């Protein structure tokens, strides 16, 4: 029965996002966001015995409900004064609507809820929060992009995403701050090219799925649990290490491709100041990925009797190997195809 209800909620979750991105009015977009929210809450609260999960789902609901109420208020004002037109909005209404969408997506300076909610979720639900749940708000943001307003959010997202992950001992919080940093890059890509941010999001989602599935299989939630995999196959440890480097955007891995495209675009437009800041802050995120990798490779602990056996089954192993191959060698394959063509 629980599996059937979860499947229904999962279908309505996808339906809500599709309603939002295909809507031609703000009210229809709001309805899609609400369908998405009310479908995701039961999926988040999959383990009722875990109080941290219940707390996270409550925090998520309160934050999203607050954002939705402000968004509905702004939409009513828009319908009353401007006949629900996307283009005929004054700055006050526009900033109010876009601020609520930034709050829903977890971008700085409205990011306060995101790491705390991530901390209480399972890896699969956290993956949905980092990827699928951002699609609808980002699509709505791309319809109305205010340069000066979003420049502040871009810089703050990259800054907080980089510095916030430095002192973390929780892998889920580290991934949350990493997501905030990547969200800054997506907004930066959106500033110049609508297709560019979609490409960035697609590759980021692929890399996140690859690394999160590995964390989920080994039940890794904190840095000290990484010592458990010191007795693992060295190839598995190497795959985690390379995936982290790819997520950090280090060449020649696939994660470098979207950043490369954004850098190229910004260089052509002469926006060197924001480009320099973005690259410098990304180096900090690469540092805490390397710090996580150091725990995997350099530190060795004796196996304790209380350590749980991992459930890294063959089926999931094959899926992970495919995703890892794409993540690690994707950029090389794209370059080879480009050279052939």
Swiss-Prot record:
It is an enzyme of class 7 (translocase). One of its GO terms (molecular function) is NADH dehydrogenase (ubiquinone) activity. One of its GO terms (biological process) is mitochondrial electron transport, NADH to ubiquinone. Pfam families: NADH_dehy_S2_C, Proton_antipo_M. It is found in: Mitochondrion inner membrane. GO terms for cellular component: mitochondrial inner membrane. It is a multi-pass membrane protein. It comes from the Eukaryota. The chain crosses the membrane at residues 8-28, 61-81, 95-115, 145-165, 174-191, 195-215, 238-258, 270-290, 321-341. It catalyses: a ubiquinone + NADH + 5 H(+)(in) = a ubiquinol + NAD(+) + 4 H(+)(out). Its EC number is 7.1.1.2. Its main location: mitochondrion. Keywords: Electron transport, Membrane, Mitochondrion, Mitochondrion inner membrane, NAD, Respiratory chain, Translocase, Transmembrane, Transmembrane helix, Transport, Ubiquinone. Belongs to the complex I subunit 2 family. Core subunit of the mitochondrial membrane respiratory chain NADH dehydrogenase (Complex I) that is believed to belong to the minimal assembly required for catalysis. Complex I functions in the transfer of electrons from NADH to the respiratory chain. The immediate electron acceptor for the enzyme is believed to be ubiquinone. This is NADH-ubiquinone oxidoreductase chain 2. It comes from Anopheles quadrimaculatus (Common malaria mosquito).
């Amino acid at each position: 029965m629980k599996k059937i209800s979860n499947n229904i909620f999962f279908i309505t979750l996808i339906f809500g996002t599709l309603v939002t991105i295909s809507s031609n009015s703000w009210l229809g977009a709001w309805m899609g966001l609400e369908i998405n929210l009310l479908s995701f809450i039961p999926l988040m609260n999959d383990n009722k015995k875990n109080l941290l999960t219940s707390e996270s789902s409550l925090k998520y609901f309160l934050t999203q409900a607050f954002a939705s109420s402000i968004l509905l208020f702004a939409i009513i004002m828009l319908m009353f004064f401007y006949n629900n037109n996307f283009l005929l909005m004054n700055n006050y209404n526009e900033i109010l609507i876009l601020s609520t969408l930034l709050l829903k997506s977890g971008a700085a300076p409205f990011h306060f809820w995101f790491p705390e909610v991530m901390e209480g979720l399972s890896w699969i639900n956290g993956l949905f929060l980092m990827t699928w749940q951002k699609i609808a708000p980002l699509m709505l943001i791309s319809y109305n992009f205010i340069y000066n307003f979003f420049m502040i959010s871009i810089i703050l997202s990259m800054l907080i995403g980089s510095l916030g992950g430095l002192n973390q001992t929780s892998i889920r919080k580290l991934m949350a701050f990493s997501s905030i940093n990547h969200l800054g890059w997506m907004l930066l890509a959106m500033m110049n090219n609508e297709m560019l941010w979609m490409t960035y999001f697609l590759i980021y989602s692929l890399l996140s799925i690859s690394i999160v599935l590995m964390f989920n299989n080994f039940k890794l939630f904190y840095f000290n649990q990484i010592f458990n995999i010191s007795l693992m196959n060295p190839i598995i440890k190497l795959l985690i290490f390379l995936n982290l480097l790819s997520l950090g955007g280090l060449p020649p891995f696939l994660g470098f491709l979207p950043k490369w495209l954004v850098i190229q675009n910004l260089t052509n437009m002469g926006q060197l100041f924001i480009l320099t800041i973005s690259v410098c802050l990304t180096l900090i995120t690469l540092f805490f990925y390397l710090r996580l990798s150091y725990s995997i490779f350099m530190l060795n602990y004796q196996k304790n009797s209380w350590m749980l056996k991992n459930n890294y089954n063959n089926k999931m192993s094959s899926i992970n190997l495919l995703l890892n191959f794409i993540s690690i060698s994707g950029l090389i394959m794209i370059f080879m195809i480009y050279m052939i063509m």
